[in-house]
Regions:
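Short beta-strand and beta-hairpin "edge-sheet" elements
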Residues: 89-133
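Short amphipathic beta-strand/extended segments with alternating polar/hydrophobic composition
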Residues: 14-20, 101-108, 179-185
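Oligomerization/assembly interface segments of phage tail-like spikes and tubes
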Residues: 45-70, 119-133, 255
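Intrinsically disordered, low-complexity segments enriched in serine, threonine, and glycine
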Residues: 135-275
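Long, hydrophobic/aromatic-enriched structural stretches that serve as scaffold segments
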Residues: 61-97
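Solvent-exposed loop and beta-edge segments used for protein-protein assembly and interaction
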Residues: 52-56, 84-86, 117-121, 154-156, ...
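Short, solvent-exposed beta-alpha or beta-beta edge segments that form flexible loop/patches at the rim
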Residues: 24-61, 110
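Polar/acidic, low-complexity leader/linker segments enriched in S/T/G and N/D
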Residues: 1-40
């Protein structure tokens, strides 16, 4: 028998419960978001593209074989509890795609269709996932202390995490398409293009009203539970001026990086992705 495939969801490994998967439902692609508009007197329809993609339901046909009814029921119950206890988007990986991961939510219950109730059960694990397949390599930081370049190996512009130490101008891309200026910074500011926020490293907190906030950090999908009455100061956005009010992205191919000498360190976690 060949190697049995399994998944890992927020640290929960299906194989620890005797559960293994097949890959029929993991290779589909998400739909592009937009609106089809019919124009009188014109053949066909006009597609108003929004430039983004919809969420996708990822389904894993799964099975469990234990040999004993009591053990079977226990394992299913434990797996159901482990998956259902995770809230919000969590990291989802599987052995079919060892070089990438998704962000998914386990929202649906786990219904077992017993093939032989005392020995095995077949069922489907469903996750509501963001459209991107994030590359593991996109988590590796690229560090600059002077001008340089970065190469996006995919066909899609990424929304990076950028950590800036110092003050001055940073320009990414040809002709500095994605440019911003940092002022009054006395340490390191994190700029998160995915959630369009800027803040200090975790732990440096200031007054806020929400109980918690989800922040995509280097390990995309980590949920930072903030204490009641805390926040990042002004979200730090007031310290940064973005050219044309656009958060930085890294477009496909080699992209130049330019920065002022007063920027002492620039760390980019690129978050490469594909569909």
């Amino acid at each position: 028998m060949g190697l049995l495939n399994h998944l890992i969801y927020d640290g929960v490994e299906s194989r620890d419960f005797g559960v293994f998967i097949s890959g029929e439902g993991v290779f589909d692609a998400p739909a592009r978001r937009g609106e089809m508009i019919s124009i009188p007197g014109r053949n066909g329809s006009l597609f108003m593209d929004e430039g983004v993609f919809e969420n996708i339901t990822v389904e894993y046909p799964a099975f469990i074989g234990t040999g004993y009814e009591e053990l079977f029921r226990t394992k299913i119950g434990d797996l159901r509890s482990a998956l259902s206890s995770r809230g919000n988007y969590k990291r989802l990986t599987d052995t079919y795609h060892p070089d990438e991961f998704r962000l998914g939510v386990f929202r649906e219950g786990l219904e077992v269709d017993p093939q032989h109730i005392t020995r095995a059960g077949g069922f489907t694990l469903k996750f509501d996932c963001k459209p991107q397949r994030f590359l593991i390599s996109g988590e590796d930081p690229v560090i600059f202390t002077a001008n340089g370049s970065i190469t996006n190996p995919t066909l899609f512009a990424s929304s990076p995490m950028i950590k800036v130490t110092g003050n001055g101008t940073v320009a990414i891309g040809d002709d500095g398409k994605y440019r911003f200026v940092v002022s009054n910074n006395t340490g390191t500011i994190w700029i998160d293009s995915e959630i369009m926020e800027a803040y200090l490293p975790a732990g440096e907190l200031y007054p806020w009203t929400d109980e918690s906030e989800t922040v995509l950090t280097q390990e995309i999908g980590i949920e930072l539970e903030l204490l009641d009455g805390t926040q990042y100061p002004e979200n730090m956005l007031s310290y940064i001026e973005f050219y044309n009010s656009i958060m930085p992205k890294i477009e496909p191919g080699e992209q130049p990086i330019r920065m002022s000498p007063t920027i002492t360190r620039l760390e980019i976690i690129p978050r490469w992705w594909r569909l």
